[in-house]
Amino acid sequence: MANVPADLKYSKEHEWIRVEGNIGIVGITWFAQDQLGDVVFVELPEVGRELKQNEQFGVVESVKTVSDLYCPASGKVVEVNTKLESSPELINQDPYGEGWILKLELSNPAELDNLLDAAAYDAFTKEG
């Protein structure tokens, strides 16, 4: 489980969320970026946009495919990672760090209980 940090929650759509106070930091997992291949473009949502859990909010485009992004929890977008506009490869290089996608002000933290922990996500990715 080296590529599944224990301090995060995961969706079955391969997004992760790290909670810091009432802010959720969202990105895609190592597994997702590995399946996508070299990321060449990321469509980011507008700051201020209200998102619901599981709502589609953008896309990640790689040399192989285009994949929709889904929000793992409800909230208002308070920041997006503008570095991804010029350096989308950060998602491949550091998906849990510099490759984060957005920060949300969480509106319903109880929704996090619907997500997978690291062990469950790791098992999910191995089900194929």
Swiss-Prot record:
- What family is it from? Belongs to the GcvH family.
GO annotation, cellular component aspect: cytosol; glycine cleavage complex
Could you give the subunit structure recorded for this chain?
The glycine cleavage system is composed of four proteins: P, T, L and H.
* N6-lipoyllysine sites (modified residues): 64
| Domain Lipoyl-binding, first and last residues per copy | 23-105
Give the top-rank taxon of the lineage listed in the UniProt record for this protein: Bacteria
Q: Which Gene3D superfamilies match?
A: 2.40.50.100
Q: Does the keyword Transcription apply?
A: no
Required co-factor? Answer: (R)-lipoate
GO BP annotations listed? glycine decarboxylation via glycine cleavage system
One Pfam family this sequence matches: GCV_H
Q: What is this protein called?
A: Glycine cleavage system H protein
**Which CDD domains does the UniProt record give?**
GCS_H (cd06848)
Cofactor binding note from Swiss-Prot or TrEMBL: Binds 1 lipoyl cofactor covalently.
Residue ranges annotated as coiled coil are none
HAMAP family, from UniProt? GcvH
